């Protein structure tokens, strides 16, 4: 069951990343349909990624109050619904606004997957599951332009959104109907509530039940905490900056490749999409290394009596990060 849940949340993460990039394959079609410049069409990507940055600050804290599953189900439903106006949009404004809403809503799965895996797996077991999750946000943007190129050439840009609807709807069904709640405090609170109803004994309580703070105060604490971690914990700040650089490079390719290969060399969108295959292959190769990396981590666990330093997880990144500037050359 743990691997089933892991596979479903990783697939959802892939779908979200795929949705962010698939439309890059036919931005020219959007510009032609609505009579706007390509820079304006690019806003459909920009606002989606901005939503990625806004959503986590609310959804991650809320999941600690409501549980993971309600946040997954509600945000994915909103995201799926707002793909439809994108597919049938009659003006660029509708497209941009709905993409922003989708970006905010789709941020929830991207944010909660790490917490879900932490709920499911012990610290020493998380290496391979986390590798599956970490690979998904990078494979999705690599596969998106590839699939989108052929779809856009054959069916037009609107089908890029119908494709998102199909994939996201499938993920919504899987997450909503097959993935149970994983957040331990929420599970315990529900179990205690059930026991109180069955026995009439009020002694069955959890830590959440004993927290008598008003909901507003709890929300304030949970909503402020991400900003405190970001700006007051150097490791969180620097990892966030590092990941921002990686994602900025990735999304820069979405804009640069069409300029280089379509405008510069006269290639079609489908042929240009093939240039993203090496990126996907690289991510898959990296994920395949995770069992070996996890083996080293297990040795560190044994060496430190089950309590290895958190920085032990950073060793593979310290070596692999140098491949990025080399690859850009």
Task: Name each region found by the language model.
Residues 1-329:
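A six-helix transmembrane bundle that forms the core substrate pathway of small-molecule transporters
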């Amino acid at each position: 069951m743990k691997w089933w849940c892991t596979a479903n949340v990783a697939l959802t993460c892939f779908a979200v990343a795929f949705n962010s990039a698939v439309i890059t394959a036919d931005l020219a079609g959007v510009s032609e349909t609505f009579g706007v410049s390509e820079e304006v069409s690019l806003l459909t990507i920009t606002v989606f990624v901005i939503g990625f940055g806004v959503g986590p600050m609310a959804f991650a804290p809320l999941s600690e109050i409501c549980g993971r599953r309600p946040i997954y189900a509600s945000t994915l439903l909103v995201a799926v619904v707002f793909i439809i106006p994108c597919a049938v949009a009659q003006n660029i404004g509708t497209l941009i606004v709905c993409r922003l809403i989708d970006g905010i809503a789709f941020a929830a799965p991207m944010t909660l997957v790490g917490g879900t895996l932490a709920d499911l797996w012990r610290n020493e077991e998380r290496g391979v599951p986390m590798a599956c999750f970490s690979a998904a946000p990078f494979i999705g943007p690599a596969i998106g332009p590839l699939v989108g190129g052929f779809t856009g050439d054959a069916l037009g840009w609107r089908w890029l959104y119908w494709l998102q609807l199909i994939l996201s709807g499938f993920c919504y069904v899987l997450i909503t109907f097959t993935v149970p709640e994983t957040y331990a405090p929420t599970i315990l609170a529900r179990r205690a509530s059930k026991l109180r109803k069955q026995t009439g004994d009020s002694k069955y309580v959890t830590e959440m039940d004993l927290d008598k703070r008003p909901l507003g105060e709890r929300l304030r604490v949970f909503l402020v905490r991400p900003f405190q971690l970001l700006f007051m914990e150097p490791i969180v700040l620097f990892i966030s900056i590092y990941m921002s650089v990686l994602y900025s490079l990735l999304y820069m390719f979405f804009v640069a490749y069409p300029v280089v290969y379509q405008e510069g060399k006269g290639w079609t969108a489908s042929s240009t999409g093939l240039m993203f295959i090496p990126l996907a292959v690289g991510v898959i190769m990296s994920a395949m290394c995770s069992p070996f990396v996890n083996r080293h981590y297990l040795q560190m666990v044994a060496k430190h009596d089950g309590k290895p330093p958190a920085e032990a997880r950073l060793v593979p990144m310290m070596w692999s990060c140098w491949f990025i500037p080399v690859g850009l050359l």
